[in-house]
Regions:
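Residues that define the transmembrane beta-barrel architecture of outer-membrane proteins
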Residues: 1-2, 44, 71-75, 82, ...
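Repeated loop/turn-to-beta-strand initiation elements of outer-membrane beta-barrel proteins
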Residues: 14-16, 85-90, 130-135, 161-167
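Transmembrane beta-strands of outer-membrane beta-barrel pores
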Residues: 20-26, 83-85, 92-96, 138-144, ...
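Outer-membrane beta-barrel translocator domains and adjoining extracellular loop/strand segments
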Residues: 30-33, 100-107, 145-152, 177-184
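Extracellular loop and loop/strand-boundary signature of outer-membrane beta-barrel proteins
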Residues: 63-64, 102-110, 139-141, 200-202
Length: 207
């Protein structure tokens, strides 16, 4: 199938990326990693050009935008840029073979969900001056019977040439499909009773 990629420098400070049916077959393969006796899911470095371009616009103190979970997009669009003291990043994409990370206090797992998913991320930063930066981030992923939304604000204060104070506060809501809820949020075993809450409508399954 034909693949179309667009990289347009609208201005020296603003960049638009778009892709339809992207071909990632030429992207370097991941390095082998051992997951024996590893209770946490493996993280792989992003190597696909669409997601790599201006990736730092979405950075924060936590790894909130992990694009490797987007396996097989049919399309994607991304806008990044700066205007005076403002920095802005937005991307939207779909995924034909979605997987999600199931977090836990002592472990994490990767689970696959049926159907197509949509993913989006928005990041904004404002530099008050050379010493103070304020930011906001929002991510959204939806599929049939699944949704996850994360919102957060952050700030960075340079106190001196050697000291920096940073903080970030986050709020998230998640709804899991019934099959995943039953698989990862069960209280059948006595030692698992403290692991999961059992909220109404499978919302915010909390590990």
């Amino acid at each position: 199938e034909a693949s179309i990629d667009l990289r347009w420098g609208i201005t020296p400070d603003w960049l638009l990326n778009a892709t339809i049916n992207p071909d990632f077959s030429t992207v370097e393969a991941d390095n082998a990693q051992l997951n024996i006796n590893n209770t946490f899911a493996l993280f792989n470095r992003e190597k696909r050009p669409f997601f790599l371009d201006n990736q730092d616009y979405f950075d924060s103190d936590y790894n909130l935008v992990y694009t490797r979970n987007i396996n097989a997009p049919n399309y994607g669009a991304k806008l990044t840029g700066r205007e005076n003291n403002h920095a802005f990043g937005l991307f939207i994409t779909d995924d034909q073979n979605p997987n999600i990370l199931i977090p836990g206090n002592r472990s994490s797992s990767v689970a696959f969900i049926d159907g197509e998913s949509k993913a989006a991320a928005l990041r904004y930063r404002y530099s008050v001056n050379n010493d103070i930066t304020l930011g906001w981030i929002s991510t959204l992923r939806t599929a049939e019977n699944y949704s996850n939304n994360v919102n957060g604000i952050d700030a960075r204060f340079r106190l001196s040439t050697a000291d920096v104070f940073k903080f970030q506060t986050l709020f998230s809501t998640t709804k899991y499909p019934n099959d995943l809820f039953k698989q990862f949020c069960n209280v059948d075993e006595e030692n698992e009773q403290a692991r999961c809450a059992t909220p109404e409508n499978n919302d915010d399954c909390q590990f």
